[in-house]
């Protein structure tokens, strides 16, 4: 017996719904893996080109740390009265790994969601990249507007660009999202695809009217009179018994 045949026996039901349920599981697992792996890659990258640094100063922003030319950039920022980069998002960086693990588990638990609860397992994956962008903008705005009035170089308050090319005083800046951010986006895409497929499965389920937040028929497809009775659908169970009798 081949692997596919073994899977088919483990997951009974109409062929199209069986295949959909397999894809739902694969997409949910892949989504969780992508979201969790994004922790190990930068979410945002920033480059500043100055006369004394023609090759540019580069900083990579991870969820829990900063890498790159952080010290050199802090020295330049000191002249315009900006705080050190390490002072930004300290709380967010402390809880980043815990939050990402929870988010990955939510995507993984989508496997067990019922018709009524499926959307609640999708929304966190959508909200996470948006929250990251909002939090990043907040700190860029805060650092660019809370400049030390006694700084050697006086410049007007500003907000560094999140994406694209910008200018700060005589310096040019370039900002892009990193691989970690795109992995998180891809994680949402896969859990959304799982959600769409799950809707098709749930809509075809004979006991969908009795479905709750968690699916009680995850590994089986309702088809026996006893299963409809347990779902509270006694009339359906009676019809099936009459058809078999």
Task: Describe every region a protein language model picked out.
Residues 1-26, 41, 46-53, 58, ...:
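Intrinsically disordered terminal tails
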Residues 12-22, 91, 112-116, 168-179:
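Juxtamembrane loop-transmembrane helix junctions in multi-pass integral membrane proteins
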Residues 17-32, 115-127:
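Alpha-helical transmembrane segments and their helix-start/interface "positive-inside/aromatic belt" motifs
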Residues 25, 29-34, 91-112, 182-192:
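Hydrophobic alpha-helical transmembrane segments
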Residues 31-44, 122-146:
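Hydrophobic alpha-helical membrane-insertion segments
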Residues 40-92, 138-175:
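Long, glycine/tryptophan/cysteine-rich extracytoplasmic
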Residues 75-140:
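Extracellular-facing segments of soluble proteins and assemblies that are Gly/Ser/Thr-biased and enriched
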Residues 145-223:
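Terminal transmembrane helical module of multi-pass membrane proteins
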């Amino acid at each position: 017996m081949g692997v596919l045949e073994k899977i088919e026996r483990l997951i009974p039901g109409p062929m199209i719904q069986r295949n959909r349920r397999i894809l739902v599981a694969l997409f949910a697992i892949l989504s969780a893996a992508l979201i969790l792996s994004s922790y190990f890659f930068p979410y945002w990258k920033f480059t500043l080109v100055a006369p004394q640094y023609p090759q540019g100063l580069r900083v990579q922003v991870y969820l829990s740390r900063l890498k790159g030319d952080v010290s050199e950039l802090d020295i330049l920022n000191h002249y315009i009265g900006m705080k050190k980069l390490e002072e930004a998002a300290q709380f967010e960086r402390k809880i980043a790994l815990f939050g990402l693990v929870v988010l990955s588990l939510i995507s993984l638990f989508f496997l067990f969601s019922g018709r009524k609860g499926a959307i609640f397992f999708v929304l966190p994956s959508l909200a996470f990249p948006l929250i990251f962008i909002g939090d990043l903008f907040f700190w860029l705005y805060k650092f660019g507007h809370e400049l030390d009035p006694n700084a050697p170089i006086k410049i007007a308050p500003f907000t560094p660009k999140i994406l694209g090319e910008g200018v700060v005083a005589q310096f040019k800046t370039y900002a892009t999202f990193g691989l970690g951010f795109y992995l998180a986006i891809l994680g949402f895409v896969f859990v959304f695809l799982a959600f769409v497929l799950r809707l098709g499965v749930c809509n075809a389920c004979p006991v969908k009217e009795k479905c709750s937040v968690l699916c009680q028929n995850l590994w089986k497809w309702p088809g026996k009179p006893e299963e409809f009775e347990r779902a509270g659908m006694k009339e359906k169970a009676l019809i099936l018994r009459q058809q078999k009798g």
